[in-house]
Amino acid sequence: MSSKELQEGQDGLVEKLVSVRRVAKVVKGGRVFGFSALTVVGDGEGRVGYGSGKANEVPVAIKKAMEKARRNMKDVHLDGGTLQYPINFKQGAANIVMLPASDGTGIIAGGAMRAVLEAAGVKDVLAKCVGTTRPVNVVRSTVNALTGMSSPELIAAKRGKSVEEILGE
């Protein structure tokens, strides 16, 4: 299922539904069906979170996933509307490649990765996922790759140097 923007919540967060799956539990009398939902929540200004929820009904599963995503928000250090530097990130079978792009490029990424980037507030990026394309793995890997990115200001503060020394200007 493609990512859908549900609404902008009462707290100003962008909420996106990435996937809904029907899951089955096999019991003695047959199968018991339920639903699993994966959602992404972000403020569009550098904070993003994801969550998954399970329930017997789709709306309840989505609500649980949204609550978990809100509790799981993380900061992303962006450079304007794009990334600080190119990212190659590997987690499990997912291999994430993201490149900063010039203004006006837009978000060139597929499905689940696009939902995360839009919710985080990234405006211009080139991105690709090699390996697994399962939405849960792609979302988890993309969020971890984005949160692992550091700004030059943070690196300079850690090293006790000025930003000019770090950037070599």
From Swiss-Prot:
InterPro entries: Ribosomal_Su5_D2-typ_SF, Ribosomal_uS5, Ribosomal_uS5_bac-type, Ribosomal_uS5_C, Ribosomal_uS5_N, Ribosomal_uS5_N_CS, Ribsml_uS5_D2-typ_fold_subgr. GO terms for molecular function: rRNA binding; structural constituent of ribosome. This is Small ribosomal subunit protein uS5. With S4 and S12 plays an important role in translational accuracy. Located at the back of the 30S subunit body where it stabilizes the conformation of the head with respect to the body. Transmembrane segments: none annotated. Belongs to the universal ribosomal protein uS5 family. Pfam families: Ribosomal_S5 (PF00333), Ribosomal_S5_C (PF03719). Residues 13-76 form the S5 DRBM domain. It comes from the Bacteria. GO terms for cellular component: small ribosomal subunit. Keywords: Ribonucleoprotein, Ribosomal protein, RNA-binding, rRNA-binding. Signal peptide: none annotated. Part of the 30S ribosomal subunit. Contacts proteins S4 and S8. The N-terminal domain interacts with the head of the 30S subunit; the C-terminal domain interacts with the body and contacts protein S4. The interaction surface between S4 and S5 is involved in control of translational fidelity. NCBIfam families: rpsE_bact. One of its GO terms (biological process) is translation.
